[in-house]
Amino acid sequence: MLNKNCLFLQVNIHLDEPRPCPLGMGFVEYQPCQPKSMRKLQIEELCRMTVEEFRAAEKLPLTIILDNIRSLHNVGSVFRTADAFRLERVCLCGITACPPSAEMHKTALGAEDSVSWTYYSDALEAVRELQAQDYCVLAVEQVQGSIGLDAFRPESGRKYALVLGNEVKGVQQAVVDACGQSLEIPQYGTKHSLNVSVSAGIVIWEVAKGMRSLRDLQSVALRP
């Protein structure tokens, strides 16, 4: 049973040299069931990068491949998540729409301008190109022999790419075959189905968290 008096706080990912914040925004240590007085932060307190700062900043070596995503809102949401975790690039493949797009902007909120992207006529082309550049490319799909996301541990020094598939058909079988490994989000309900942008948020957070933890341990954390 959920204790309504418990306080849940966002987990902080420390950077070696955080950007200066004039109003001193920061996270506090989590203390179970210790309610505190809290005030919502204003926009100017969030220490957000400018688009130019984002483009110049070091990125997490993680790329997202979108395989025939039909909804512009889903594409925009993935851009926004990629911006949030400072990912390298988004690969837009097949029928996946490219910026600029008013519909995409509704969910991307400008992240389509900050995050680098490349268009490929087929996701298989993107997979093979990234593999040739020594990326470990993983499909996000329900397959035999998939790796549970909760069990996945990124390797130190590796570059990764994640393939997310069409809202109805998922990742193409040929792309799954080319990847050779697949991540699956454990699910416990009746549907065993998540919206692709929701799946993207879950998987990107989990993989990025593991990759950043390794980099922090090596004292080479991302710097703005």
Where are these regions (language model features)?
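Hydrophobic alpha-helical membrane-insertion segments
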Residues: 1-2, 13-16
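Post-transcriptional modification and biogenesis factors for structured RNAs
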Residues: 7-10, 20-224
